[in-house]
Amino acid sequence: MGGSSEQERLLVSIDEKRKLMIDAARKQGFTGHDTIRHSQELDCLINEYHQLMQENEHSQGIQGLVKKLGLWPRRDVMPAYDANK
């Protein structure tokens, strides 16, 4: 799963793409070729960020549930394997 550095990278990319889209819209209008291209690329970045956030929430949710239910391996229940025995 992606970490916070991936989230930060995506947020920076989203902000940069948004600025490019706004600049293109000011120069070419809302239906200009570059405006639409930047808008579509921005949509992809936002979708990627949203998917990453959902994956992180799911992963954290599963880990929290496992710990809450006491299913996390404990040393007293599952001692370390000793190959010499």
Swiss-Prot record:
Gene3D superfamilies found in the cross-reference section: Helix-loop-helix DNA-binding domain (4.10.280.10)
Assembly mode: Interacts with Spo0A.
DNA-binding listed as a keyword: no
Domain of life per record: Bacteria
Name of the molecule in the record: Aspartyl-phosphate phosphatase Spo0E
Miscellaneous comment text of the record: Mutations that block the onset of sporulation in Bacillus subtilis are called stage 0 mutations, or spo0 mutations, and at least eight genetic loci have been identified in which a mutation can result in a stage 0 phenotype. Stage 0 mutants lack the ability to form the asymmetric septum characteristic of the initiation of the sporulation process. In addition, these mutations have many pleiotropic effects on the synthesis of a variety of transcripts by minor forms of RNA polymerase in this organism.
Family of this protein: Belongs to the spo0E family.
Pfam hit, one: SpoOE-like
